[in-house]
A protein has these predicted regions:
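Hydrophobic alpha-helical transmembrane segments
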Residues: 73-95
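Hydrophobic cores of alpha-helical transmembrane segments in multi-pass inner/ER membrane proteins
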Residues: 21, 83-90, 145-161
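Interfacial helix-loop-helix junctions of multi-pass membrane proteins
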Residues: 60-76, 122-146
C-alpha cells in the first residue's frame, strides 16, 4: 500500500503568496481612501496599513499624495519594488520559469545578477542622500523597479514552483 507524505498543495502556497502580493500592492494605495471612512473597521485597517508602511519604507514622507491630506503609505521607490514583483509574478504565470530571463537557472551567475539589481535601491538612495540629485518620483520608481526585478526574477520561480510529491511504500 502506498501513502503520500503530507505536503502543501501547490495551489495553497501560490495562493497564499498571491494574496500577500495583492495586499502589499493594494494596501499603500487603498489606505488614503480608507482613512476617509469613519466607520468600523476601516480606521483600524488604515492604522495597520500605515503602521506597516512606516516600518518598511525608509522615506514614507516622500510618498505620493493620493487623497489629500493622506499620502500613500510607502514612497515610490518601495512601490516600484512591488510593481516589479507583480510583473515577475505575471511573467512566471506565462512561462512557468522556463524563459531565459529567470535568474535561478543560472545558479551563481543568476544570484550575482540578482544581487547587483537588488543593490540599485540602496545605491540610488545613498546618491540622493549625498545630494547628487534631488528626490524625483520617476528616478526612485525606476530604481525600485530594478531592485524588484532582481528579487522577483530570482525568487518568484522558487516561491511558485510545484513541490514534488513522493510516494512511500509501507
Amino acid at each position: 500500500m502506498a501513502r503520500l507524505s503530507w505536503q502543501p498543495l501547490p495551489i495553497q502556497r501560490s495562493a497564499m503568496a498571491d494574496v500577500i502580493l495583492v495586499a502589499l500592492v493594494s494596501g499603500p494605495v487603498a489606505a488614503p481612501f480608507l482613512a476617509h471612512i469613519p466607520f468600523f473597521p476601516f480606521p483600524i485597517i488604515t492604522n495597520i496599513i500605515y503602521w506597516m508602511g512606516r516600518r518598511v519604507c525608509p522615506q514614507p514622507d516622500m510618498a505620493l499624495m493620493v487623497m489629500p491630506p493622506n499620502l500613500m503609505t510607502v514612497c515610490m521607490r518601495c512601490y516600484g519594488v512591488l510593481l516589479a514583483l507583480v510583473l515577475t509574478r505575471l511573467l512566471f504565470e506565462r512561462d512557468r520559469g522556463k524563459g531565459a530571463y529567470w535568474l535561478h537557472q543560472y545558479r551563481f551567475l543568476g544570484a550575482a545578477i540578482a544581487t547587483v539589481l537588488t543593490f540599485a535601491y540602496p545605491i540610488e538612495m545613498i546618491i540622493e542622500l549625498l545630494g547628487w540629485w534631488e528626490y524625483n518620483n520617476y528616478i526612485v520608481t525606476t530604481f525600485g523597479f530594478l531592485t524588484g526585478l532582481g528579487i522577483g526574477l530570482f525568487l518568484v520561480p522558487v516561491l511558485y514552483r510545484k513541490p514534488n510529491l513522493k510516494t512511500y511504500s509501507v
